[in-house]
Every structure is written in structure tokens, then in C-alpha cells.
């Protein structure tokens, strides 16, 4: 509300969430390392399928003796490892804090991965008998996500073809394992490898292994946040403070769809998509505060000004 807006500018008119980063401690030097690994198994969350009747996608066919549970075989165990290192040191005058963390994970669907690096550096200092306080902080982040699966829909979702494939295999045709190892086949007419699947090219589904191998995508994000704060105590009642903040974000995305992909979402020769965006937000404020306690009353007053500038640009290309 108004108090938050007075302290943090007009952007905080509806409230503010303050995130305070760690800083060094006086008289102590600490080095900390931690490592954490988690495993994820998607097999426990997939639907239950009948394995008694074969046939095509529109109806059940003849009774069969059973079907391999290829849906569970499609998924792998996802593994995420987080390693972090921090260093803190300080004296009465200056305190230093540095940290680095790496997150690397592989998803439950093949060829998907996440690699993330976080750096943080903070320096705090006090001068002039603690009348002047300086606080500087820089955070750097780089993230690379490869082959992020489609969250829903038909054409880009490998689960569509996985779940709709006939139990026991296609009548008079091949098993699911065949389409797993032969998700692409050589087309003599075009002299190239094209998608191999039991349905027509525009049936809302594609070979799941074609989607995970022949539609690679890569999303990279770079982010830098820098903060600087200066606070000077003029006397017992007045304090003047200046703060500055810069937040830069760069996103890069690339996706390739090889020839043979469903022509509802790609051309006969494939499709190429690339996007790049850069956003910069700069904020600064200057504030004079007054505080005095008179018996059972406390008087607080603030006077200040703030400035904010947001800019961004983006460029993209889509061959389809």
C-alpha cells in the first residue's frame, strides 16, 4: 500500500515482497559446501491401460494374450543434482559474501536436460564511525534448458502417440518397439529420412521418439541483477539514502523440426524457429527520513523521489 510505495516506489503500490540476500558475518570466515540429489519416476503417475484387447485407435479388436507395458518403458528416471558453495568473511568495517550453485537435471523423457548456474556476490561496509553504510550486491544466472517437452496439445506432445498406440501392436502391422527403433526411415523418392508411424501424417499424433529426437529445442536465459545502496546518517534524527538497481534479462530460444514432421505444424522441408529478447529495468531513488521519539510517541517522516526506466527489444524468425 502507500507505506510500501513510499519506501520502494510506485511499483510497490499494491505491496512488496522483500528478498534479503545473505551477507558476511563480523569476525568469522565460513566456507560451506552442500550437495543434494533427487530422483523422479513418472511411471507411478501414468494412466492404467487395458491389455486384453488389441485393435486400432477407434475400437477394440480381438482379444490378445497380453501386451508389453511400453508406456512405462518410454519414461526414464529423472535425476536432479544441486551443488552449492558459499564463502563469507568479515570485519567490523567490511563484510563479504560469495556463493555459487549449479543445478543439473535430466528429465523423465529422453534427451531433456536443465543446466543452471547461479553466482552471488555481496559486499557491505561501514565508514565514518558507522554513519555511512554501503551495500553492494551482484547476482548472475545462466540457465540452459534442452528439449523441454510440450506441456499439452496434440502435435508436439509425445504422450499423445504413446497413449493412443493400439495395445498389442497394430493389427497386421508392427509393434511399438519397432516404431521405437525405427522412428525414421529412408524415403527413396526424397532421398532423406522421414517420420515412421502407423497413422496418417495429419492424425493429431506423431511417433513419440520422432518428437524427442527430431524436434530439438534449446532455451537459454541470462540474467544479471545489480544493487547499490548508500545510507548516511546526518544526525540523530535525519538519514539520507540513495539506492540503485539494474535488472537485465536475455532469453534465446531455438527449435528445429526436421522434414517429416506433421505438416500441420511444419513445412514439407521442416521448420525453424528462433527468438531473442532482451529486457532491462533500471530503478533509482533518493530518500530523506526523519525519526524522533518524544516520550511515548515516535515521529516518522519521509521525503523522496524515485525514477524507473524499462526497455526491451525482441526479434524472431519462423520459417513456417
What would you call each of these model-derived segments?
Residues 82, 114-120:
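Transmembrane beta-barrel architecture of outer membranes
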Residues 25-68, 108-109, 118, 122-223, ...:
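Surface-exposed loop/interface segments of Gram-negative outer-membrane beta-barrel transport/assembly proteins
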Residues 1-32, 80-82, 103-106:
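A beta-strand signature from Gram-negative outer-membrane beta-barrel systems
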Residues 79, 83-89:
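Structured alpha-helical segments in the cores of large, soluble enzyme domains
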Residues 21-23, 89-91, 125-127, 230-232, ...:
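Residue-level signature of outer-membrane beta-barrel architecture
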Residues 74-78:
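Short Gly/Pro-enriched turn/cap motifs at secondary-structure boundaries
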Residues 12-14, 116, 281:
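Short, solvent-exposed loop/turn segments at the edges of secondary structure
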Amino acid at each position: 500500500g502507500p507505506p510500501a510505495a513510499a519506501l520502494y516506489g510506485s511499483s510497490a503500490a499494491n505491496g512488496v515482497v522483500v528478498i534479503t540476500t545473505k551477507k558476511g558475518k563480523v569476525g568469522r570466515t565460513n566456507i560451506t559446501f552442500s550437495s543434494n540429489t533427487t530422483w523422479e519416476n513418472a511411471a507411478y503417475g501414468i494412466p492404467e491401460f487395458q491389455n486384453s484387447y488389441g485393435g486400432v485407435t477407434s475400437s477394440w479388436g480381438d482379444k490378445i494374450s497380453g501386451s508389453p507395458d511400453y508406456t512405462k518403458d518410454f519414461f526414464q528416471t529423472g535425476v536432479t543434482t544441486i551443488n552449492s558453495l558459499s564463502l563469507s568473511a568479515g570485519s567490523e568495517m567490511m563484510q563479504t559474501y560469495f556463493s555459487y550453485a549449479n543445478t543439473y537435471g535430466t528429465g523423465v523423457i529422453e534427451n531433456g536436460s536443465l543446466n543452471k548456474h547461479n553466482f552471488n556476490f555481496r559486499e557491505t561496509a561501514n565508514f565514518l564511525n558507522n554513519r555511512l553504510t554501503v551495500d553492494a550486491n551482484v547476482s548472475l544466472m545462466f540457465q540452459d534448458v534442452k528439449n523441454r517437452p510440450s506441456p499439452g496439445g496434440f502435435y508436439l506432445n509425445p504422450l499423445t502417440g504413446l497413449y493412443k498406440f493400439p495395445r498389442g501392436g497394430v493389427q497386421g502391422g508392427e509393434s511399438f518397439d519397432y516404431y521405437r527403433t525405427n522412428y525414421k526411415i529412408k524415403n527413396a523418392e526424397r532421398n532423406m529420412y522421414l517420420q515412421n508411424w502407423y497413422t496418417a501424417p495429419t492424425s493429431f499424433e506423431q511417433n513419440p521418439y520422432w518428437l524427442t529426437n527430431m524436434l530439438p529445442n534449446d532455451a537459454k536465459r541470462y540474467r544479471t541483477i545489480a544493487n547499490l545502496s548508500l545510507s548516511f546518517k546526518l544526525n540523530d534524527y535525519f538519514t539520507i539514502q540513495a539506492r540503485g538497481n539494474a535488472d537485465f534479462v536475455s532469453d534465446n530460444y531455438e527449435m528445429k523440426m526436421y522434414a517429416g514432421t506433421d505438416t500441420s505444424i511444419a513445412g514439407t522441408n521442416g521448420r525453424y524457429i528462433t527468438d531473442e529478447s532482451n529486457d532491462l529495468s533500471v530503478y533509482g531513488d533518493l530518500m530523506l527520513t526523519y525519526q524522533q521519539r518524544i516520550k511515548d510517541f515516535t515521529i516518522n517522516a519521509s521525503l523522496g523521489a524515485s525514477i524507473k526506466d524499462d526497455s526491451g527489444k525482441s526479434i524472431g524468425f519462423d520459417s513456417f
